[in-house]
């Protein structure tokens, strides 16, 4: 209540200053017009002197107006500065009250509802991305298992090939040995046959 009354009284003082300024300006204009009319009605002063007095009177009126406006501005500016400070204080108080209201009642305004919707949309997009990454990870795990199975099969096949090569080498060695033995046996038989034929001839 005290803040409202002080703001109300300050507003009244500012309005009163503006009204006083307007009244003084109107009075100066009225006085200038009256003086000019008197000079024109008198008709006793030469034309040039009357024109000079009009110019001088107009300059005085303009100076008085400028001085009055500066004086009123000096009174209004502190009022505006004070009002700006009060608005700033009111804004901080309203912000704090709004935060407390949200904490107590959980009833956000349209702006925060839009922000929550945007946040919810972002969360949904992140969840979709996570699901996609999980699918990719699952496929990678399956490919990894398949690669392990293929690697085991490849190792088994290599072992079998090595065994077959070893067996083939052994058979080749055996066949060579058999051939060698056969040749030796044939040579022995042929030598024995020559010896027998010589004995018969003697």
UniProtKB/Swiss-Prot annotation:
A lipid is attached at residue 2 (N-myristoyl glycine). GO terms for cellular component: cytoplasm; midbody; spindle midzone. The keyword Ribonucleoprotein does not apply. GO terms for biological process: spindle midzone assembly. The keyword Phosphoprotein applies. Signal peptide: none annotated. Residues 112-146 form a coiled coil. Residues 32-42 have a biased composition (Basic and acidic residues). Disulfide bonds: none annotated. The modification Phosphoserine is found at residue 92. It is found in: Cytoplasm, Cytoskeleton, Spindle; Midbody. It comes from the Eukaryota. Keywords: Coiled coil, Cytoplasm, Cytoskeleton, Lipoprotein, Myristate, Phosphoprotein. Residues 1-11 have a biased composition (Basic residues). Residues 1-20, 32-52 are annotated as: Disordered. May act as a scaffold to regulate the recruitment and assembly of spindle midzone components. Required for the localization of AURKB and PLK1 to the spindle midzone. PANTHER family: COILED-COIL DOMAIN-CONTAINING PROTEIN 69 (PTHR24200:SF6), TOUCAN, ISOFORM A (PTHR24200). Belongs to the CCDC69 family. This is Coiled-coil domain-containing protein 69. It comes from Mus musculus. The lineage of its organism: Eukaryota, Metazoa, Chordata, Craniata, Vertebrata.
